[in-house]
Amino acid sequence: MSEVKVSLKGRVIALLLGCVFLVTISEFVVRAVYPSWSEFYAGRYMVTESVPGHGIVAVGKAGFDGYFAQNNGDFRAHIKINDFGLRNDDPAVAANQRVWILGDSMAFGWGVEADEMYSSVIGELINTPTYNVASPGTNVCGYQALAARMPKDISPAAVVVGLIIENDLSNYDCPATAKAAESSDRASTGSTFNLGTIKQMLSKHSALYNFFAVSLKRVSIMREALIWVGVIKKSHAYRNPLEGKDMEQIAKATANELDRLRNMFDANTKFVVQIAPARFEIANDDPAYIAARLRLREALTERGIPYVDPIDRFKADGFEATHFIHDGHWSAKGHRIAAEETAAWLRSNLPQ
């Protein structure tokens, strides 16, 4: 009986070792024949930085020059980060008296080439140099941090803040948030080992995982199966993080922090908020997001903060024409629409 048990145990061990060997060999083979596997991980070109008085903010990895792609085939874009951690060819000191574009992933140009992102298109349209001061994963408090870390001996000719309705509206208190971050050692007190972190880890380290992710996501029946079991999310699935919250207070708090951002610059510096309307309003006239956008506009007006709202242009051109198929970000067409609307405001308000 013991011999049978040993035999079964040995077979199981042999099977496991064989699987490990097969996966290891496959990993090395895929790395050799599929060198672009690492392009799907955005963390390759992003780092975090502590900004005194503003806490932690995400910025680009200085000197990065490579490609970033979506494994669903939406895009493959060249990303070049300068020595200051921003997506510009010129150094930060060259930003003096340019039009600064502050924002998160949309302003950063997620998925589009550098000459297609709206900061670049604005510069072409108004024949005035611009400078991209944007970083994925930030919010209004992060925009304050990005502005604060710019060289102290330079200043903008104007500031455009890209504000995303879906992500950037919150009951902010940026000074309190920064103070809490600086007084904390930011140590994790609980486990974050879940499906999301596993996928992120595999995206970062495994060529084999990325190969299968690309292959499966591009086969319709397999993609639907993965959505059904919860491994991947449905494209443009409805989400509203503001649901059930006090929209009046959220709009007011957001406008207050945008005003704080405006006051970080000289009083004569032209300042405008470019509103990025929600996907679900553009595609389906979602009433919750319509209400959120209109309440934000009211709060900005109460604060005397100018804004550009390109909702009519986006609705005229349509959701599919202005966004990536699976990703929630603007395509090159969406960037151009936003740039044209904002450029019109700048032409009317900047000295000629």
Q: Whereabouts are the PLM-identified features?
A:
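N-terminal Lys/Arg-rich, disordered targeting/topogenic segments
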Residues: 1-8
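Hydrophobic membrane-insertion alpha-helices, especially the h-region
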Residues: 13-28
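Membrane/wall-proximal cationic-aromatic binding patches
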Residues: 33-128, 239-241, 314-318, 325, ...
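Conserved SGNH/GDSL esterase-like catalytic core that processes O-acyl groups on lipids
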Residues: 92, 108-187, 191
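Short, amphipathic alpha-helical "lid/cap" segments that border enzyme active or binding sites
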Residues: 140, 144, 251, 255, ...
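Serine-dependent acyl-ester chemistry module
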Residues: 164-297, 310-319
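Catalytic His-Asp segment of secreted/periplasmic serine-dependent ester chemistry enzymes
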Residues: 281-352
